[in-house]
Amino acid sequence: YIGMGELYPAEPTTNVMMGGIGVSNSNGIYANSINPALLARNHYTVFEVGVNTELKTLQDYRQKQQVFGGNYESLQLTLPISNRWTASIGIRPHSAVDYTTKSYRRLNLLGVDSLIYGYEGKGSVTKLSFANGFRIGKEFYLGLEANYLFGTVNRNVSTQNMSDGQFYKIQLENLNSYSDFSFKAGLAYRKSLKNDLFVNVGATMDLTSEMSATQLNRFAIMDLSGMNMINADTLRNTYNFTQNLPVTTRLGLSLEKIAAWMVGIDYSQTDWSKVDNNLGRSTKQLPVSTKWSIDGEYTPDFTSVSNYFK
């Protein structure tokens, strides 16, 4: 989003394949990073590695561009501490900025394109998480996730004159550094109906709406390659500002038959109204977004190792 970049999905790969649901449901085999309370259903040590790839297409009436990229999705280790307590530690990308745009202009009507305007953004924010899930009694679950967010995002605007024989690139740099903690709480309720049939209810809420950040602005002159700096001048020394964050609340309901099937529905609401731009100043108020997800899973024979569809 504005400032810290495009957000990565909060759901792990196993939940993405089910439309992102996971607020109320967990099979106890894969680690649930959507609702920390449901970690208490994991009674085995689990280590997960996820990767993410994407293909983007940018197109207008004159030209078309495709961008392909990828990144690690998550590294997570889940450890049962006791029969009622499970902890998890992991690292995953939180957001990223990655774009490069150029435009060309002639200095006169008869000349060739000799001015190059460049707009570039690079950087990312990483999330290091430590979560705990507790089972209270037989039917209630509570969880808390603590995250440390850190990273840098650099946005540059440049002008390069190709007609003077020097080819110097004049660049205005805006470097933002992020470092702070965030928290998320979760709860779940699991009620037995009959014959291994359960109804599950869950909820999560972000407890942090802002984080600390610093910004440095400087003016630089680069050579033709754009790699070597000839001269630089700090326009404004590093100063602190507060980056407002979107706050998400999730609710989930699911019906589950152990080791057989599960159907569920999740609702999430994200408040973007206080999110500001990368300069720490308010922009036009953004709306509140909502999302509904309905999906499920079916296992023909949970104990089969020779044929998945048995």
What is each PLM-predicted segment?
Residues 1-17, 80-310:
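Outer-membrane beta-barrel porins/channels
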Residues 1-95:
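N-terminal, post-signal peptide beta-strand-biased segments of exported outer-membrane/organellar beta-barrel
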